[in-house]
């Protein structure tokens, strides 16, 4: 019907122009009036045909097709009752027929209820109506399946039951669009959001309720989702992520409070790096929520008040529109904060002491916003190169100690070869002042390319005299610095020189005409298996270093938070209220060594016939 409509308008306009030129102004006016009232002949014929077609089809559906019955009935209910009583029969009357004989169906069942339910497929009887959308179904199981599609709509309020008209989830479409689509097509996308037909609401983009259905807070319940004020139609789904920022902050406060409670109850050993890492794992990346860092001043976060998205009465203010978050129960008093700060300090020291295990063999790259806040000494950071030539910037993590400085013995000597024997003073020592048994802590790469040997201050290496040259070792570095085991022989790079680079090619043939041999080109390319092994090991070390770094960041953030609250005195005073002068004589203050003052008129010892028992501490 819609395609021929544009073609009919030019034909009618041409006929009216011809009539107007022949008859005059009056006839043209009458022609225009007739145009607005009289429809096109083709349109009338099509509408008449469409109106008669459903009537004939409905009459055909009300004829009994059971074998050669061909009896006609006025309603589907009468046809259904006729088939059940006349053709199916009953067992009590000894005429039960369990085989469907509608046309050529021949469906056989085992019970009468089964075949009577099957007959609904042939009869246009739909007695089962959906309460949500009003759609009718033939069988109850079909309605049951259909109702499951409205599972997400079970909390919605029907428009007829909503007294305020503006608090339901599914507002009625505007009156101006009733001629396009009286029932807008609703569907759910893959995210579970309710959508509507875009074509039906295309011209209503300026209307607040034309492009989407937004959830509104109900004033009948205490818990609901708040929606921020929205003044324009949006194409993306809204969802329930309006208060995501506040939820993240509340979740962060809960996790920090749980961590403080576990630390106070000594459920976390401050000297165990493994337990500290497991307890800090939930806080990784959560102390910097999208709305800003965790600060001590924000003890409550008010939520925005609900705003109407579409036309209708403004909902009344719900008392739960603003939610106030109380301070942390585990860090309320000054004593709690001091205790937590002490435990955090012990945990921080433990993390520092385990830096050699977490950062072994990891190169600290230069970063623009590097992590330079955790240095042991106030001395300025240094800048040196790792054995691979990578520059270690001053913004990277560099706890400064004597071991992090490049030893003059590892510098290039006058002969152009690096010193072979590593000095004992530049090695990493544990708390027992013995050389670390791990080979990674003794390798030159770990000593200068990472922070494996920065735990304890070591004796600085004195520069040799100029006459000795830089190729000789200092007196303080002579002597064995290893244990007597055979591990020294197979340490793998401890006393071995690094492989020299490829020799320079001869310069007589620079034209490039000759092709290098395969063996020469293969020297510079490692095998894929070795590269994959190295990459996996490197990735594991980097992940371990990232976890260690994140633990240090979390501990520093928590300590800054606790110290900030102590400096601003943001804690609950635990001062006890003064005792009343007319308290009971049996009240005993266990904290005070002195008894409450005796009131005037009380009998002293000896003035009564019975002795007065002294209370403890009196």
From Swiss-Prot:
Zinc finger (C2H2-type): 62-87, 98-122, 128-150
Major location category of this protein: cytoplasm
Gene Ontology molecular-function annotations: DNA binding; zinc ion binding
Function: Transcription factor that mediates regulation of both acid- and alkaline-expressed genes in response to ambient pH. At alkaline ambient pH, activates transcription of alkaline-expressed genes (including pacC itself) and represses transcription of acid-expressed genes.
Keywords from the named record: Activator, Cytoplasm, DNA-binding, Metal-binding, Nucleus, Repeat, Repressor, Transcription, Transcription regulation, Zinc, Zinc-finger
Similarity-based family: Belongs to the pacC/RIM101 family.
Compositional bias of kind Polar residues: 447-465, 511-522
GO biological process terms held by the UniProt record: positive regulation of transcription by RNA polymerase II
Cited PANTHER family: PH-RESPONSE TRANSCRIPTION FACTOR PACC/RIM101, PH-RESPONSE TRANSCRIPTION FACTOR PACC_RIM101
InterPro entries to which the protein is assigned, alphabetical: pacC/RIM101 (IPR050806), Znf_C2H2_sf (IPR036236), Znf_C2H2_type (IPR013087)
One annotated Gene Ontology cellular component of this protein: cytoplasm
Region (Disordered): 1-59, 144-180, 375-396, 413-540, 571-618
SMART domains: ZnF_C2H2
UniProt biased composition (Low complexity): 13-58, 422-446
Compartment(s) where it occurs, according to its Swiss-Prot or TrEMBL record: Cytoplasm; Nucleus
Name of this chain's protein: pH-response transcription factor pacC/RIM101
Domain of life, source organism: Eukaryota
Basic and acidic residues bias spans: 144-155, 571-590
Residues spanned by motif YPX[LI] motif 1: 456-459
Motif extent (YPX[LI] motif 2): 610-613
Modification after translation (UniProt): Activated by C-terminal proteolytic cleavage by signaling protease (probably palB/RIM13) at neutral to alkaline ambient pH.
